[in-house]
Amino acid sequence: MIQQESVVKVADNSGAKRALVIRVLGGTRRRYAGLGDRVIVAVKDALPNGTVKKSDVAKAVVVRTVKETRRKDGSYIRFDENAVVIINDNGEPKATRIFGPVARELREKRYMKIVSLAPEVL
């Protein structure tokens, strides 16, 4: 569960390292974001030669959460960290690589480019 003011890791090579969630997209009263949900983030830590800079505002999709997520078969999936991938307005990643595993829920939410770039899908 990711909410406003959550600090998340950026799991791609866009240049950002840490980001602050400033809005959960999907309705005016939406409080929490889970796997595959879109958020708006402000970059807090960035590499000097990356495509995104510190204090940039960007859209992102949640790829890992510490809070467990229940699947239809009754199993649960959870990760060691909260992580996002920065995307453009079309839902495609700005980066060319993705670090760490991503959840299978991204395939169900039609983020095929992120799933194909990921080294592992759990």
Curated annotation (Swiss-Prot):
What the record says about family reads:
Belongs to the universal ribosomal protein uL14 family.
**Domain of life of the source:** Bacteria
PANTHER family xref list:
50S/60S RIBOSOMAL PROTEIN L14/L23 (PTHR11761), LARGE RIBOSOMAL SUBUNIT PROTEIN UL14M (PTHR11761:SF3)
InterPro entries recorded: Ribosomal_uL14 (IPR000218), Ribosomal_uL14_bac-type (IPR005745), Ribosomal_uL14_CS (IPR019972), Ribosomal_uL14_sf (IPR036853)
Which protein is depicted?
Large ribosomal subunit protein uL14
Record GO terms (molecular function): large ribosomal subunit rRNA binding; structural constituent of ribosome
Quaternary structure, from the entry:
Part of the 50S ribosomal subunit. Forms a cluster with proteins L3 and L19. In the 70S ribosome, L14 and L19 interact and together make contacts with the 16S rRNA in bridges B5 and B8.
Q: Per its UniProt record, what NCBIfam families does this chain match?
A: rplN_bact
- Write out the GO cellular component annotations: cytosolic large ribosomal subunit
Q: Which SMART domains match?
A: Ribosomal_L14 (SM01374)
| Pfam families named among the record's database cross-references | Ribosomal_L14
